[in-house]
Amino acid sequence: MKRLHLAGIIPVANLKSDFQIPTPEILLPVSRDLTAIQKSVFECAMAGCNTIWIVANDDIAPIVRSTIGEWVYDPVYYRRPTRHSSEERREIPIYYVPIHPKDRARRDSYGWSILFGIHSAWYAGCLSRSLGRQHFLLEAKAGF
């Protein structure tokens, strides 16, 4: 039986809005301690995504990366009633993908950033399946 891998795609590249503010719109607060991008990542985690892909160009990616980070805890395993719940927590990795430079001037839309995020997640999955597990194992020689 095949296991389903659910990838959450959050497109923030080429996001256009009606707000006239100098900061990116994804950093606007939606509640007391939560910004819009943090809420999107939390909703992907609550939906059961195994990976989260944020499509952000190079101008906004460092801001998003400093706000979100590289991973988020899976909310299902965060507060399990076990003796050592901190050891059973699972992390959901967050990947940052920029739009390809040849597509930035021609295919510069919100919909294209969604499609590019889907394609990047699919391509990474195909690449990891074709390489197999043996290519990622490193063996240390005795004495090191």
Predicted regions and their residues:
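N-terminal glycine-rich phosphate-binding loop and ensuing alpha1 helix
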Residues: M1-H84
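Conserved beta-loop-beta/alpha segment of the NTase-like Rossmann-fold superfamily
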Residues: R65, D74, R83-F144
